[in-house]
């Protein structure tokens, strides 16, 4: 008798009314079964070579899927990494590359990076396939979702499906913008919102609070080519001299729970970040034009009063629904 492949439950990403449209015509169509498989894999330490590290080891839901340390050493080698763990949300809108330098074009290819990196999960993909094939539940789930046995290409497809559902769109600010539940912003939050639009929106723009582009925000005056150019930002990918020192703009959403900050986690607090933009900008040939507007002094003037207002508004961008959503939590 011919085996009948189960029908999948197709999923369309929900898009809030204050969010831009999302191009969800993926080569890897979303299904409820694929998303659930991806969630289980995301939290499974079997994905690492020593069976001790999962994706969730560095991407913790309660802090918007980052890890609260500047440079983690939780990977298989216990060596401190060279870049800060980015948060994970609204990735379905990220079409300009992933990682801090855009070195990966999509979530599927991105997953191979940490899986095989000797300092992160240090996994041999052939051995991973063999190990997962020993688990009947995984064998069944992969067969349902992909109609074939477990393959590394389908492992990363499942992870990508789950990560595309990590949507953060329900902060206090969102409810205010959508006129929901009588939510209002107080005077300090409103003042901060105005200041963010005036002083930050050249990069942190739109409903996503990021332009998903690459900028040199004045962290350093020179850019070492040590560690295969990892400190050179986007240049490491494009080899365009105009991209030296440029890193991808992170979203301001959930920023109050995702310390420390920058691609290397150098700033411990939001105050440190604001002080950097006010008085710590390092000039270089590729410094972003928006940081050259201050009468010849690089940076963005931010007074202590303005700093309080900005922080108040940034707190209104914390999405407590997202960081507590059971759909994104460990299924075990």
Sequence positions of predicted segments:
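Periplasmic c-type cytochrome electron-transfer domains
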Residues: 1-332
